Amino acid sequence: MPTLRILALLAVTALSASAAEVKYQLAPNFLGTPPGKATIGNGHGEIAVDSAGLIYVSVQEKDAGIQVYGQDGKYLKTLALPMSLHGFVIRKSTDGEFLYGAVLNEQRFIKAKLDGTVVMEIKPDAFPADKGTAKDKAGKSVNALKLTSCDVAPNGDIYIVDGYGKSWVFVFGADGQFKSVFGGPTQVVDGKGFANTHKVFVDTRFSPARLLCLDRGNNRMFHVDLDGSNARMIANKGLRNPSSASFHGDLMCVAEIAGRISVWDKEGKMVASLGVNDTKGQTSTPKVAPADWREGVVTSPHGITFDKDGNILETEWNIFGRVLRWNRK
């Protein structure tokens, strides 16, 4: 009996320690603005942190699609990248550290150095013709791709999702050559095809790595193997339309566009909820004005990232542009 009591106490202690590890505190007014601007500008994209701790935020500005900030939140510079980097990640490999991005309005993929130099491109005609074309009202073939997100697997394969189109997930080699496609409306997971699979991320918390699919049209998120098989549901109830995610240690943070940031453990249990907004008309919209923003309360979370210390940064779908930060306690 004493042994059982000791084990029980250890279990409670472990649970308490685990809970303490996922507490966060808002860092008010963390991010600055570019010179002469009251806000960062029209946001409908993503946020990421490089290995040096610099913060990259995409905005809807022509030839100035990425703003770079220091670890202290102060504006540093703008990169001359496309204005519609709806989804991007920063990944480090043996050949360096690069930004990988899905250019929504141009339906192409880019790989760029962190100074903004584009070193590789996957153009629209590299995608399978039967997945990337449609007929307009006049019967003319048009490009139907609507690329929203991308990520890179440990072996260098590139995953690109057609999240505003048919939700196909395209796989390209590190050299930019097409390899395969899965997902879309014809691949059924728990009775439903992929729908508005807004963003996908390679989840290296698992071995082998898996692909996280934020299937926003069905208000759910699930894993598949990197070949698209073996779907595993993470959550399909109680979500607020998951739009982006990031990983740190065993944790995953999720930006939910209907007004919430959630944090999940590796077993798929939600362990924290941040910035919840239940005010009608203030979520799933880009039009909430700065006068209506409330400290620590989100509007329409669209992009999210952990930094190297496990702090959370979130960027919103907002025509004025907004970034919030929560520090890990």
Feature-to-residue mapping (PLM):
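Blade-loop segments of beta-propeller domains
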Residues: 34, 63-104
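Beta-rich, blade/repeat-based domains predominating
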Residues: 37-51, 82-100, 127-157, 187-210, ...
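Surface-exposed loop and turn segments in beta-propeller and other repeat-based domains
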Residues: 27-38, 119-141, 177-195, 272-296
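Beta-strand-rich domains and repeat architectures in extracellular enzymes and scaffolds
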Residues: 28-64, 148, 320-321
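Conserved beta-propeller blade signature
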Residues: 54-57, 98-101, 157-160, 210-213, ...
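Blade-level signature of beta-propeller repeat domains, shared across WD40, Kelch, NHL, RCC1
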Residues: 297-329
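Short loop/turn segments immediately following the C-termini of beta-strands
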Residues: 60-61, 104-106, 163-164, 205, ...
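Loop/turn-rich, solvent-exposed surfaces of beta-rich toroidal or solenoidal domains
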Residues: 208-214, 237-279, 286
